[in-house]
A protein has these predicted regions:
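Glycoside hydrolase catalytic-domain context in secreted enzymes
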Residues: 1-549
Length: 549
């Protein structure tokens, strides 16, 4: 789940003799090193070459965003492929290495901003162009599979993953989904040599989580539909549009339906969609009957990470081999995040998993490798990867800027303060605190951020941006003509902690501590959380600057 080059640049990976060192590209296994735990139980962020050479894992999830040179990512991909080729020469299976990635921001607005921009002019050309630009860079550096886009239609403002959606309108999200499939897969006739494999998520729509909680943890395991037909009307349309344009893969959600009266039963074309209280990756009704047979999905199904060990809602009493068997027989082709194929072997040997179901899963997943011609020529040129980033990323800056302008609405311009006069002195004050969930992920991604306050780095970035535009930045409000407040709420590592809802709270909140990543039971302790650091200072600062006119 956490695959990133040891160092971000080729210069750092090159020794005094001018040769690249493999150990600075792909981490070498150190038997004495204690594995670093990941953000969820049973997962590690200590990924090294033993995962390929000993466990024969043929894929990983890249977490370096744009921090690593494109050429370094290509070299990491090549190293993984070469290790697999070495194993194949000893009698293993010749499968090229696959690097997955979550969506990486290349300067365009994030998802909600994309949704806002599309609503603004009703045009998705910008979305298609963004996807085409990103596709070319991804292919050049070996990022062949995207865990995205997230086409959940948000229906509860408390849900912490709303920021990753395109908003609350099914029609807008559907239009965006179509443009993304065409752009990333290089057409709408399925995969080809130029395609990035898209894994749209989280089927059949994860937004109606009970009370807005997130299903990575048990407190958020239930999907509650409040009205008849809401799944078909609001949550399924973006998936249907993606299926119509031959999206290559889907990722089911962790959550499960509630059948105890809390939710209204959901139908699709007049038939009940599902009755079994299990996560979607375990539901044959949803994966095979609904997605494949009724909605026409024709790709492979990739589960989210940890469904056999962590998010085991409703299958707690099954053994791990039984869980694998149930998920695969339900129609899931790839079990994400796990590195224990022995459980699949045992499921077959014990008669739990029909060999035909395993063959179907293997065929569906391998088909994407052949359709994108990765088996024929798996190695990449790092120089071409670097050049592809220069050509596409730099070339997209103007369009990305225009997209950001479309995504932003000026709510207020008191006394025509904007645009600022270049003669005005600006003081920058930031309000962003410590996000423990982000810090955990940053540590896993090798960013070296740790659990730190990001205000200093944020102020530095903003100062440079203002000065580049010709403004004078001063240190204190007393010196300033204009006070720039950069307000950035955080969610207290919400996905993994569930301490608070992701809304701006006016001050600190004292709440019950819960077991992180486990049962979410209350520990008996209290914790203090705040989504907006030092919020009480905003009025004080505003009064001070207004007093100066």
């Amino acid at each position: 789940l956490f695959n990133t080059p040891v160092v971000p640049t080729r210069a750092e990976a090159t020794n005094a003799e001018g040769k690249l060192e493999l150990g600075k590209i792909y981490k070498h296994h150190n038997p004495g090193e204690k594995p670093m735990p990941g953000p969820l139980p049973g997962m590690t962020v200590s990924i090294d070459d033993s995962h390929v050479l000993e466990k024969h894992i043929a894929a990983g999830v890249y977490r370096g965003d744009m921090r690593c040179e494109a050429g370094m990512v290509a070299l990491y991909h090549n190293a993984g492929t070469q290790m697999l080729e070495y194993e194949a020469c000893k009698g293993g299976v010749a499968i090229p290495y696959s690097l997955h990635t979550n969506p990486i921001n290349i300067g365009y607005p994030d998802s909600l901003g994309i949704g806002a921009a599309v609503i603004g002019d009703g045009n998705t050309d910008m979305v298609y162009e963004m996807a085409q630009t990103d596709r070319k860079m991804m292919k050049a550096e070996g990022l062949n599979i995207m865990y995205g886009p997230q086409v959940d239609v948000t229906s509860d403002p408390r849900w912490p993953r709303t920021s990753g959606t395109y908003g609350e309108r099914p029609d807008v999200t559907s239009d965006i989904a179509e443009a993304l499939v065409k752009g990333y897969q290089d057409g709408d006739n399925g995969l080809n040599e130029g395609s990035v494999v898209l894994t749209i998520k989280h089927f059949p729509g994860d937004a109606p989580s009970e009370n807005g909680f997130e299903p990575h943890v048990p407190i958020g395991q239930w999907r509650i539909y409040r009205t008849p037909g809401s799944m078909e009307k609001y949550h399924l349309p973006p998936f249907q549009r993606a299926f119509d344009h031959k999206v290559s893969s889907i990722m089911p959600d962790y959550s499960r339906i509630a059948t105890d009266g809390r939710a209204v039963p959901q139908t699709y074309r007049g038939e009940i969609t599902s009755t079994e209280e299990v996560p979607s990756a375990y539901s044959k009704e949803l994966i095979t009957d609904l997605a494949r047979n009724k909605m026409g999905f024709d790709g492979y199904v990739n589960s989210d990470s940890g469904i056999t060990t962590v998010q085991i809602y409703g299958v707690e009493n099954l053994t791990e081999p039984e869980r694998y068997a149930k998920a695969i027989s339900a129609g899931t082709d790839v079990i994400g995040g796990n590195t224990d194929p022995e459980n699949i072997v045992k499921a077959v040997e014990d008669g739990l998993l029909p060999k035909a179901d395993l063959d179907r899963a293997s065929y569906n997943r391998l088909l994407s490798l052949f359709r994108t011609k990765r088996v024929d020529n798996p190695y990449l040129d790092p120089d071409k990867a670097d050049q592809a980033r220069v050509d596409n990323f730099d070339g997209a800056k103007k369009k990305a800027y225009e997209a950001n302008q479309k995504a932003v609405v000026l709510v207020k311009n008191h006394e025509k303060l904007l645009p600022l006069a270049k003669s005005q002195k600006v003081c920058i004050v930031t309000f962003k605190g410590v996000d423990s969930g982000f810090a955990q992920m940053a540590q896993a991604m090798g960013a070296g951020l740790g659990n730190t306050d990001e205000d200093a780095a944020l102020r530095k970035t903003l100062t440079e941006a203002f000065e580049k535009k010709g403004y004078t930045v001063v240190a204190t409000p007393e010196e300033a003509d204009v006070l720039y407040l950069h307000v950035w709420p955080i969610s207290n590592g919400l996905v993994f902690n569930q301490y608070a809802m992701p809304v701006i709270e006016m001050g600190e909140i004292v709440t019950d501590e819960r077991e992180r990543n486990k049962s979410q039971k209350k520990t008996g302790n209290k914790v203090t959380v705040v989504t907006l650091k030092d919020v009480e200072k905003i009025k004080e600062l505003a009064d001070a600057i207004h007093a100066r006119g």
